[in-house]
Amino acid sequence: MKDSTDKDFTAHTPMMQQYFRLKAEHPEILLFYRMGDFYELFYDDAKRASQLLDISLTKRGASAGEPIPMAGVPHHAVENYLARLVQMGESVAICEQIGDPATSKGPVERKVVRIVTPGTISDEALLQEKQDNLLAAIWQDSRGFGYATLDISSGRFRVSEPTDRETMAAELQRTNPAELLYPESFESMDLIENRHGLRRRPLWEFEPDTARQQLNLQFGTRDLTGFGVEQAKLALRAAGCLLQYAKDTQRTSLPHIRGITMERQQDGIIMDAATRRNLELTQNLSGGVENTLAAVLDCTVTAMGSRMLKRWIHMPSRDIDALQQRQQAISALQDITPDLQPYLRQVGDLERILARLALRTARPRDLARMRHAFQQFPDIREQLAPLDIDSVRRLVSLIGQFDELRDLLERAVIEAPPVLVRDGGVIAPGYNAELDEWRALADGASDYLDRLEIREREKLGLDTLKVGFNGVHGYYIQVSRGQSHLVPIHYVRRQTLKNAERYIIPELKEYEDKVLTSKGKALALEKALYDELFDLLLPHLAELQQSAAALAELDVLTNLAERADTLNYVCPTLSDKPGIKITGGRHPVVEQVLREPFISNPLSLSPQRRMLIITGPNMGGKSTYMRQAALIVLMAHIGCFVPADQAVIGPVDRIFTRVGAADDLASGRSTFMVEMTETANILHNATENSLVLMDEIGRGTSTYDGLSLAWACAENLANRIKAMTLFATHYFELTTLPEKMEGVVNVHLDAREHGDTIAFMHSVQDGAASKSYGLAVAALAGVPKEVIKRARQKLKELEMLSNNASSSHIDGAQLALLGNDEPSPAIEALEAIDPDALTPRQALDWLYQLKKML
């Protein structure tokens, strides 16, 4: 395109001049330029769209003496193409014809009516119904980060101020924005460079005074103190840029964005990016959604409920009062869940319908769904009436009634409206007398035409005569070619077909004009009445949004009640005393995919028992046992019941996992480097109220290096940090730690050998494992028998070399290396010597003495 626009602008056709003017306003994004029934793309946009969408690249005539590269998509299928582009992280400007071709001199007037970007979509066809779709902005300076997210399809506006890179990375992973705005001065590009939907913005868009002004204008406030964000200077920079971008792309006001909320780390259990990934909360390690915690817990019946549940899972709360209210509601709802859920299912995705209402893009079927939702409210209230629980009563009051709005929509919109208002037939008969009159005139055509056909056929004696209509020529009287010579002179030929002639007569032409006028008037009036419905509904937007949020929460709680009942979960006790005590704990995901019964296990952590050294064979269940502890704690902190016979959960501020690792090739980091980075994060940030899972630390280096690191990390966690720690290891040397430190206990996962086979008992027992069963597991995995046989021989040789009867005994040299805290006499003597004060004879004597000390 650049080459063409460099030429004299006037050398182009008027239509292309119009195109270039509009394209200049949106140089970075694709421009869908409406021409009749198609959206066309030209020049570089056409080439790019052709590649992305796999559509034909053609040429359209010439402009300025050169052929114009062109690609196009039909207007009726545009949503499908937009959805594909948005999923690729692309943005599109939609340019519509707003002038009347019949009255336009020169090109029809056009303008960009909306900009579709990955983070600002609200159309049902473009959104994934069970996932939040977030627009985000990020700011960074020497004090840390400012981060803002907006879900334009609900109006949810959040800000936070992560203090370091690890916290910022965790926020990006938790929120997973579809589109991310960042300043041109942004330094930590490695944090974001692999994300889709990146948008580089000029620095002035992050100006703090402008941000405050924008936000106060949006919320109708004088300052932001009431939202608790007045002092969040970094976050406000990001929020200001984000809000301006949303307004620029939507080309309309955003009345559903009515406030902003500060998210503070201390309000919830903090999890870093590695922990979220390893616990497979909403996404498994392969990137899918199967066999995740969300997959087990999410049987919600509305999409907005599903999205809320996932937000709860990713932000476990530490507000004990709020969690206990959720527990009480779940207990109360268990008896009525089967009766309540069918009504909730009929409510649908009210949250996103309201966003489209606010943006004035709601379609007729959105209004029909809203009406259907309102019709469920009396039944929902009736179901909840017997429950005398504060949290349930609060939800009932927020849901509201909206009888007047339901009545309005029942009177105004037909039962099953068409997709688009421009198709007509949306407003119900009887709602507006004038509309009914115009429709009667238009709809009376068939009776009139039947009468005209019978009259003319009998009058002229032409048995082939019939009256019809088509979209090109309008109304006509058709006579067969064989009888066409018999028509009277006032029949004016309108169209010739192979076997027939079509005519128009003055009476029919006059009626045609009247019918077409009435259809046009009816459609214009219907559009005006439809717009008026928005004006009648929007004053209630705030209460409607509260109602939708309450219904989503009710759906989540009812769903968790059903899950607790179906999956045999128990209500955990949330205690203010430190520690975790679980009886008969189960892994919520693994127990669902196992064919055989899951072996439940206890867990006890307290200030006197703060670290478990976990040993046992590979495949014995160490990782499952550790993860289930973290998941039970997390579930308790979303208010959910848990898979256990009994659970008492004390204060937990963070959950850390150092479980498994893979190379981070994109960042040039080896498995061991990834492992050590995650370990460093734990050692720097864990507290005595943190739950820490450490699985096989130190595997990626030599035995002595790995053992030394594992020992030192365990020591640090147990003695300095005093965190609640599950420490799984194959280094049997670590099983001596309980002898050296208070609060450290050995447990193991049991297994039994029968000849060449091994049976995993999956039960947690006190004490250290007797052996690792590595060769038995290798045989189970299908390692050739000759290799296993050779390994057994080699094992015996190694055991003999270390003077051990079995591999469970501890290498004395390694224990000396790690466990000997006594200072060496030789080293003490050396430190006391002043070499400059010694004669050669004295130096030689000292050398002999030091030799004896070793």
From Swiss-Prot:
* Keyword Nucleotide-binding assigned: yes
Question: GO molecular function of the protein, one example?
Answer: damaged DNA binding
Which sites bind ATP? 616-623
List this protein's GO terms for biological process: mismatch repair
**Which UniProt keyword terms apply here?**
ATP-binding, DNA damage, DNA repair, DNA-binding, Nucleotide-binding
GO cellular component labels: cytosol
Keyword DNA-binding assigned = yes
Q: What does this protein do?
A: This protein is involved in the repair of mismatches in DNA. It is possible that it carries out the mismatch recognition step. This protein has a weak ATPase activity.
Q: Which family does it belong to?
A: Belongs to the DNA mismatch repair MutS family.
Which HAMAP family does the entry mention? MutS (MF_00096)
Q: What is this protein called?
A: DNA mismatch repair protein MutS
**What is the scientific name of the source organism?**
Pectobacterium carotovorum subsp. carotovorum (strain PC1)
GN (gene name): mutS
